[in-house]
Structures are given as C-alpha cells and as structure tokens.
Amino acid sequence: NSAKEDKGSIMVIVGTDLPLGERQLKRVLKRAAVGLIRTGSFMGHGSGDVFIGFTNANGIPDTKEEQFHMMKYFPENQLDKVFRLVAEAVEESILNSLTCAKAMPGRDGEIYHSLSEFL
C-alpha cells in the first residue's frame, strides 16, 4: 500500500564534548537511529535519513612549535552509557520538535497544522 510507504527524511546532528575517536563516534551515530525508531520511524527505502556527528573534545593547537599532539579517548568499556544517552537525546529532540512546532503555510497556501494545536 503506497499510503503506508515511508515518506520524508530527517537529519540528526550529534555534538559532544566527549573525547571520542572516529570509530567510536561512528558507533555512537549508529545508536542515534535507536532514538528515531523509538518515535515510530522504520527508516524505509524511501527515507533519506542522515546522521552526522562531531566532538570538540580534542582541539588542535594553533602553535606550530608542537610537533606532536596528545589526544584523549573515551574508555571503550563505558560506551554503553553513551549509546543509551544518545538514543534518549535523539528521541527527546524529535518529540520536542513535534510538540513545540507551530502551524505553518505550505505550498499553494495549504496549512500544515501542528500537534501543539491539538494538545
């Protein structure tokens, strides 16, 4: 049934100050999809869901005098907590955007109503 096909896309941006390495950040982003799924999405073939993330924990010094730079990394055995927290944060962000949005006009003057009008 085409009415039940997945429609729409979402972009999820995860920012953290945890000192995550590239591989760790990719693992965290995979768990961000759990928050999306908790809100009812099934991420079908037609959806264009994008997950990007960054950490600002390990800055790069501006001085050229330092030949080497020490980086910190988050302990692997504590990543389960981060996975759980990112899923909760994504879920909460989606629910907040749904309940706090305002009605707005769309194409050809069609009004897209907000859930906040009915709550």
Where on the chain are the PLM-derived regions?
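A structural signal for small-residue-enriched, beta-sheet-centric alpha/beta enzyme cores
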Residues: 1-119
